[in-house]
A protein has these predicted regions:
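Acidic, low-complexity intrinsically disordered segments
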Residues: 43-96
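Generic structural hydrophobic/aromatic packing signal, biased to beta-strands
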Residues: 13-15, 29, 44, 86
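Short, charged/polar N-terminal "headpieces" of proteins
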Residues: 1-25
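Phosphate-binding glycine-rich loops and adjacent basic patches that engage nucleotide phosphates
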Residues: 2-11, 33-43, 96
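Generic structural motif
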Residues: 18-20, 32-36, 89-91
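Short, flexible N-terminal segments of the mature chain
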Residues: 25-51
């Protein structure tokens, strides 16, 4: 059986938030090439609101374009389906 080759290039936006207790939360917002920072910020805010529902309030601190890369298969599938993907990095609950 052949494994699907990932060909999608994505933009990675490095994102930080902070919980009410001071914990730093780090995650990436991944968009297809041609995305923009306002879209990445909107998706980051939606994610922060979603995870704040189950914990103490979380505040978005910063988001900035970091780099482009070839998407991993899971990321490619999520971006193709939803138009974006959140990848947790540090102190971040699973977004899915």
């Amino acid at each position: 059986m052949f494994q699907k080759e990932c060909l999608m290039e994505i933009e990675v936006y490095d994102t930080y938030a902070q919980s009410e207790n001071g914990s730093k939360i780090h995650f990436d917002v991944m968009l297809p090439i041609g995305g923009d920072e306002p879209t990445a910020k909107k998706k980051a805010k939606e994610f922060v609101e979603k995870i704040s529902e189950n914990t103490s309030p979380i505040r978005l601190e910063s988001i900035q374009f970091c780099h482009t890369e070839t998407a991993k298969l899971e990321v490619e599938e999520k971006v193709a389906k939803d138009g974006y993907c959140i990848v947790p990095i540090e102190n971040c609950p699973d977004p899915y």
